[in-house]
Design a protein with these regions (language model features):
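Outer-membrane beta-barrel biogenesis signature
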Residues: 8-45, 49, 187, 229
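Transmembrane beta-strands of outer-membrane beta-barrel pores
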Residues: 46-50, 76-82, 100, 114-120, ...
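Residues that define the transmembrane beta-barrel architecture of outer-membrane proteins
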Residues: 54-58, 86-92, 130-136, 161, ...
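Residue-level signature of outer-membrane beta-barrel architecture
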Residues: 64, 98-100, 142-146, 181-183, ...
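Outer-membrane beta-barrel "beta-signal"
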Residues: 93-96, 100, 225-227, 252-265
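Detector for outer-membrane/organellar transmembrane beta-barrel domains
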Residues: 127-207
C-alpha cells in the first residue's frame, strides 16, 4: 500500500497536481502559471531514468480557468516497460486552485486535490481493492515575480488510505516542501529549476511496516522554449536522494530525464 505516495516519490517529476500554479498571460512553465478566465490549458509530460531507459511514464494535466482566480484541472498518468511488455494506468486526479492574493508581484495560491492510484494496475483490475490507494491533498504556494526572475515556495499535506472516506483509520500522511525558480532569458528561452522534499509524518505505513522519517529530496533543472505566448516545449533532468531511516541518506541511482509540452487556448 501507500502506492500513490511511493509512485509520486519515484516519479516526482510526473506528480499529479504538484503545488504549482502564475497569473501570466502566457503559458511557459512558470511556477505561478494560472489560466485566465475562459481559457483551457494542457500540460503533457514524458519521463524516464538513465538506469531504466526501457521504462517510460507519461502524464497529462488538462485545466480550465473558471475565473481569473479559480482554476480546475484533471490529471492522469500511465507507464510502460520494455515496449509495453508491462504497463499500467497509474493515477487519476481532480484538483482546484484559488489565487487569494495578487499584489505588487506577490501571489498566493491555495490548492486541493483528490486522486487514486493505481487506476488499472498491471495484471490487476480497475480500482483494485487490494492495490488502489486514495489520496486527499491540500497545499499553499507563495511566489513573487521580480523582473525576469520568478521565485515560489510551496507546502502541501497528503492523506492516503485504502478507501476514499475511511478517515477514522490511521492512513498514511506525507508532507511536501519545495521551492521553484523561473528565469526568462529572452522572448523565447527560459531556465527552470526546483527542489522538493517529500516525507512521511508516520512511523508506520500500510501493513504496519515500521519507517523512521522516510523521505526523498528531488532536484530538477531544465530549459524551455516558447513558440508563442500560447505554447512551449521544455526538457529537464533530475536527481533524487532518499532515506529509509533517520541518518541513512543515499543518492538514488541514475537521473531522471524528460520533456514537457504546454498549450493554452
Amino acid at each position: 500500500k501507500g502506492y500513490i505516495m511511493k509512485k509520486l516519490t519515484l516519479t516526482s517529476l510526473m506528480a499529479v497536481f504538484a503545488v504549482s500554479a502564475a497569473n501570466a498571460a502566457a503559458i511557459n512553465d512558470n511556477p505561478l502559471y494560472r489560466p485566465d478566465q475562459g481559457k483551457f490549458y494542457s500540460m503533457t509530460e514524458v519521463a524516464s531514468n538513465s538506469k531504466a531507459t526501457t521504462s517510460w511514464a507519461a502524464a497529462e494535466e488538462f485545466g480550465y480557468g473558471i475565473t481569473d482566480k479559480l482554476a480546475i484541472a484533471v490529471a492522469t498518468s500511465v507507464n510502460e516497460t520494455d515496449w509495453f511488455d508491462s504497463s499500467d494506468w497509474d493515477t487519476m486526479g481532480l484538483g482546484l486552485s484559488y489565487r487569494v492574493m495578487d499584489m505588487n508581484g506577490w501571489m498566493v495560491d491555495l490548492t486541493g486535490s483528490y486522486g487514486v492510484g493505481p487506476v488499472m494496475p498491471y495484471k490487476g483490475s480497475f480500482l483494485d481493492k487490494d492495490l488502489t490507494d486514495y489520496q486527499w491533498s491540500i497545499g499553499a504556494q507563495v511566489g513573487k515575480t521580480m523582473g525576469n526572475l520568478t521565485l515560489a515556495g510551496h507546502v502541501a499535506m497528503d492523506y492516503v488510505n485504502s478507501e476514499s472516506f475511511n478517515w477514522n483509520d490511521d492512513g498514511w500522511h506525507t508532507v511536501r516542501l519545495g521551492a521553484d525558480a523561473f528565469l526568462t532569458l529572452n522572448d523565447n528561452w527560459a531556465l527552470v529549476g526546483g527542489v522538493e522534499y517529500t516525507g512521511t509524518t508516520d512511523d508506520k505505513m500500510f501493513g504496519k511496516v515500521k519507517v523512521e522519517n522516510a523521505g526523498t529530496w528531488t532536484g530538477t533543472v531544465g530549459v524551455n522554449y516558447n513558440f508563442c505566448e500560447n505554447s512551449f516545449v521544455g526538457a529537464y533532468v533530475g536527481r533524487a536522494m532518499s532515506h529509509k531511516a533517520a541518518g541513512e541518506w543515499s543518492t538514488d541511482a541514475g537521473f531522471a530525464f524528460g520533456g514537457k509540452f504546454g498549450i493554452q487556448f
